UniProtKB/Swiss-Prot annotation:
Its main location: other. One of its GO terms (biological process) is flower development. The active site is at E116 (nucleophile), E136 (proton acceptor). Pfam families: 3HCDH, 3HCDH_N, ECH_1. This is Peroxisomal fatty acid beta-oxidation multifunctional protein AIM1.
Length: 721
């Protein structure tokens, strides 16, 4: 039976009209809900038998905020009229300016537009542990129902700017201390207390307070300006390329200088401008792209149910293995960690303990929970504990023969239902499992380092992997708070393959005479957290040197070969691992560019000898971004063409979560579509004419450029899934 969506009103014998929002699961404020609220508030205000009003959400949730689907519709059509009028017509006129008091009965959550409705009420009664916040900036917009004006007046300017700029939610308990919540009562008493409170206001026993007109928590103008100055510095630091943070501060300032209602009008104007910004389009796209990853054709739509995974064995206790073990333990999954000798095993155990300790010291985990997690952990040197595990994750070095032997051994000792997963990032799954008889149970579980912190899990499906195994691993991914993205089997899979040109393009530029520290600076200014040389230092240059030949074997027609990494290692520089790479790493301080590395770069330039006329090329920052990232887009096109991902948006979310491509740019494919396939094709064609096949446009990119199509528009008929 379909759940009813709408707004209802019931008037009790006490004269209180209870208006209820019903839109499962979180009572989001879709257009029909907003229309219903307007209708019911008009009705309640006009009826003589109504003394006061209580606003509540159905099924123990007040409201999760405005319906994000509307943003998506606006982005597709460019039609702002799809955005309903809420801020003035409903929130100000019908609710806050109502002659009859309105009390919000808050349970579960009041987020975004939900909290904004609650703040327009004349009082707020809440149950404990309700979640309160204004997360709109994470979608590229600002609060649009008066939140920029009312929150500072209820909790103070400093706390309000902190909550809004950082999209930080608080509990109803904290809200009560701050004055956002007027009364905190047991869940069963929220409605009855709200009714009584509303009547007490109506009959003069409690004050009739309009949040928009309060000034008692704003402070003096000079104090407000000092807080806003700090807020601008914070915005510059956390969101240098995004407009919504600075716009939000401007709107808050408008209300402080010219009054709350003036601020509301400015907020509505700025909100509409931001809705159509590239930033909002990118962030909303990422939101829906993440949702879409949970739908995998012929896996999630064929009636299968995930099997419980209660015990997992991890083989290899290095950086990756210990991180994977940590992630599993944090979700109360028993873990057996296997190593080849006692020394390596102790290192692995200590790494897991250090991960837990770090989370506790940063306030991300309580000591009790860390202790409970570690009680589920056991280290072993043989396979005796493997007979009852539900899954094995192999996380040893990238050695084909070693991995083949491990899979042959675990097939013998594990139960027939056990999932056999590899964390390989470069080796073909079919090759790893070719000596086994259990090819349907073999799957890639590619975590990103550090595995207990990075949010992406690439689930790699070979031509033999069963749908049940994929579904089981997707469930495990969600249980350990990862975003699982199912991809096809190829060298590098989706993320590493798409981004392998990233460091190569940077090496080409450096060998063409461009300053490598400038390259890193330009790329971080674009929005990636690390430039290509910083990333190389972080990963360790030994890894780059080891995987290079694997990629060259398969993708050799479009690789740039540079001696720079080898020269770096020969000079004793392995990056952050040993304190020196392109940068100097000292404990307690930020990495510093190492000028002495330039002699190595110069040697590499002489050996490659690609500078035109022996002189460094001159490039703009824009050209650096294009020469680094357009080859990445080009490889993304090949990934799409070969059907390595189910949909283009899967590659977007994988690029954001796996390579930290800026979410506000929507992911690598979305960004490329924003720039324009034709422009990218023409630039790559020109670059290939000057610098060779590394930049040669792919067939997929050329087709879309010539036909005026977006890269995301058409899925390849080929599939590796």
């Amino acid at each position: 039976m379909a759940k009813k969506i709408g707004v209802t009103m019931e008037v009790g014998n006490d004269g209180v009209a209870v208006i209820t929002i019903s839109n499962p699961p979180v009572n989001s404020l879709a257009s029909p809900i907003i229309s219903g609220l307007k209708e019911k508030f008009r009705d309640a205000n006009q009826r003589n038998d109504v003394k006061a009003i209580v606003l509540i959400g159905n099924n123990g949730r007040f409201s999760g905020g405005f319906d994000i689907n509307v943003f998506q519709q606006v982005h597709k059509t460019g039609d702002l009229s799809l955005m309903p009028e809420v801020s003035v017509e409903l929130v100000c006129n019908l609710m806050e300016d109502s002659r009859k008091p309105v009390v919000a009965a808050v349970e579960g959550l009041a987020l975004g537009g939900g909290l904004e409705l609650a703040m327009a009420c004349h009082a707020r009664v809440a149950a404990p542990k309700a979640q309160l916040g204004l997360p709109e900036l994470t979608l590229g917009v600002i609060p649009g129902f008066g939140g920029t004006q009312r929150l500072p007046r209820l909790v103070g300017l400093a706390k309000a700017t902190d909550m809004i700029l950082l999209s930080k939610s608080i509990s109803s308990e904290e809200g009560h201390k701050l004055g956002l919540i007027d009364a905190l009562v047991p869940p069963g008493d929220v409605l009855s207390t709200s009714r009584k409170w509303a009547l007490d206001i109506a009959e003069g026993r409690k004050p009739f307070l309009q949040s928009l007109h309060r000034t008692d928590k704003i402070g003096s103008l000079s104090e407000a300006r000092a807080i806003l100055k700090n807020s601008r510095q914070l915005a510059k630091k956390i969101a240098p390329n995004m407009p919504q943070h600075h716009a939000c501060i401007e709107v808050i300032e408008e209300g402080i200088i010219h009054g709350g209602y003036s601020g509301v009008l400015k907020e509505a104007e700025v909100f509409k401008q931001l809705v159509l910004s590239d930033t909002a389009k990118g962030l909303v796209h990422v939101f829906f792209a993440q949702r879409a990853t949970s739908k995998v054709p012929n896996v999630t739509d064929v009636g299968l149910k995930p099997r419980p995974i209660k015990k997992v064995a991890v083989i290899g206790g290095g950086l990756m293995g210990s991180g994977i073990a940590t992630a599993l333990l944090l979700s109360n999954i028993r873990v057996v960690l296997k190593e080849i000798n006692s020394e390596f095993l102790m290192k692995g155990i200590k790494s897991v303990e250090a991960n837990m300790k770090s989370l506790v010291s940063r306030g991300k985990l309580t000591q009790d929970k860390a202790g409970k997690a570690l009680s589920l952990f056991k280290g072993v040197l043989d396979y005796t504990e493997f007979n009852d595990v539900d899954m094995v994750i192999e996380a040893v070095i990238e050695n084909i023969q070693l991995k083949q032997n491990i899979f042959k051994e675990i097939e013998k000792v594990c139960s027939p239902h056990c999932i056999l997963a590899s964390n390989t990032s470069t080796i073909d799954l079919d090759v790893i499992g070719e000596k086994t008889n259990s090819k349907d149970r073999i799957v890639g579980a590619h975590f990103f380092s550090p595995a207990h912190l990075m949010p992406l899990l690439e689930i790699v499906r070979s031509k033999n992997t069963s749908a049940q195994v994929i579904l089981d691993l997707m469930a495990v991914g969600k249980a350990i708070k990862k975003v699982p993205v199912v991809v096809g089997n190829c060298i590098g899979f989706a993320v590493n393959r798409t981004f392998f040109p990233y460091s190569q393009a940077a090496h080409m530029l450096a060998n063409l005479g461009v300053d490598l520290f400038r390259i890193d600076s330009v790329i971080t200014s674009f929005g990636l957290p690390l430039g290509p040389f910083q990333l190389g230092d972080l990963a360790g240059h030994g890894i780059g040197l080891a995987v290079g030949p694997i990629y060259a074997k398969v993708y050799g027609d479009r690789m740039f070969r540079s001696p720079m990494t080898e020269l770096l290692l020969k000079s004793g520089r392995n990056g952050k691992i040993n304190g020196r790479g392109y940068y100097i790493y000292e404990k307690g301080s930020k990495p510093k560019p190492d000028p002495s590395v330039l002699s190595i770069v110069e040697k590499s330039r002489k050996l490659t000898n690609i500078m035109p006329g022996g002189k460094p090329i001159s490039v703009t920052d824009k050209e650096i971004v294009e020469m680094i990232l357009f080859p990445v887009v080009n490889e993304a096109c090949r990934v799409l063409d070969e059907g390595v991902v189910i949909r283009a948006s899967d590659l977007d979310i994988a690029s954001v979560l796996g390579m930290s491509f800026p979410s506000y740019r929507g992911g690598i494919v979305f960004w490329a579509d924003t720039v324009g396939p034709k422009y990218i094709y023409e630039r790559l064609k020109k670059l290939s004419e000057t610098y060779g096949s590394f930049f040669k446009p792919s067939r997929y990119l050329e087709e879309r450029a010539m036909n005026g199509m977006l890269l995301s528009e058409s899925k390849s008929s080929r599939s590796k899934l």
